[in-house]
A protein has these predicted regions:
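Structural signature of the two symmetry-related core transmembrane helices
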Residues: 62-77, 158
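Helix-to-loop junctions at the C-terminal end of transmembrane segments
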Residues: 46-59, 145-146
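Residue-level signature of mid-helix packing/kink "hotspots" within the transmembrane helices
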Residues: 41-49, 131-135
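Loop-to-transmembrane helix entry/capping segments in MFS-fold secondary transporters
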Residues: 30-31, 113-126
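A membrane-interface helix-boundary motif in multi-pass transporters
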Residues: 142-161
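Helix-loop boundary and gating motifs at the non-cytosolic
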Residues: 1-36
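Intracellular juxtamembrane helix-capping segments at the cytosolic ends
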Residues: 100-114
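Helix-loop junctions at membrane interfaces in 12-TM secondary transporters
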Residues: 79-91
Length: 162
């Protein structure tokens, strides 16, 4: 599961990090970038608020897998967006991707290790599934963005989640 989280995050974090390039490629400027960032951030809040209720219906592992699927869907939807309006409309998918990922990964790490090892489990989750994946995803995506633009970067993001 840690490997799936690594690749899911490696695919989705460059979208946040290079959102300015995505907005510019759709004809937007600073105002549109602010709107896109707002939509992404605001859509994560409901996920955090309803996570406890959702977890009563399914395991954190299942929620984690669902979030990774939506991390794969988001770059595909961005690829399909032909206008700035469509790009902005895609941003709330963050609710079902990263919005669910973060609380589910915390709970999953706690459930997967012995109580005495939970600090190490959370540290490993943070280092591998978030820090290293973001570092590598951003490095590769930045290169691909220079090499072939946002389309190539988004195909990389999609491929990471598979």
């Amino acid at each position: 599961m840690l490997i799936a989280c690594f690749f899911g995050m490696m695919g989705v974090m460059p979208i946040s990090n290079f959102l300015v390039s995505l907005v510019n490629s759709h004809g937007g400027g600073s105002t549109a970038l602010g709107a896109a960032q707002f939509l992404m951030a605001a859509s994560e809040l409901p996920s955090a608020l309803v996570f406890g209720l959702l977890q009563k219906r399914m395991s954190s592992a299942k929620i984690l897998l669902i979030s990774i699927v939506f991390m794969m869907v988001k770059p595909l939807l961005i690829l399909a967006s032909g206008s700035l309006g469509m790009l902005l409309a895609v941003q709330p998918v963050q609710m079902l991707g990263y919005g669910l990922f973060f609380p589910a990964s915390v709970y999953f790490a706690n459930e997967s290790v012995a109580p005495a090892d939970r600090v190490q489990g959370q540290s490993l989750r943070t280092i591998v599934a978030i820090s290293l994946s973001t570092l590598l995803g951003s490095l590769v995506s930045g290169y691909l963005l220079d090499l072939g633009g946002t389309t190539l970067m988004l195909w990389f993001s999609t491929g990471c989640a598979f």
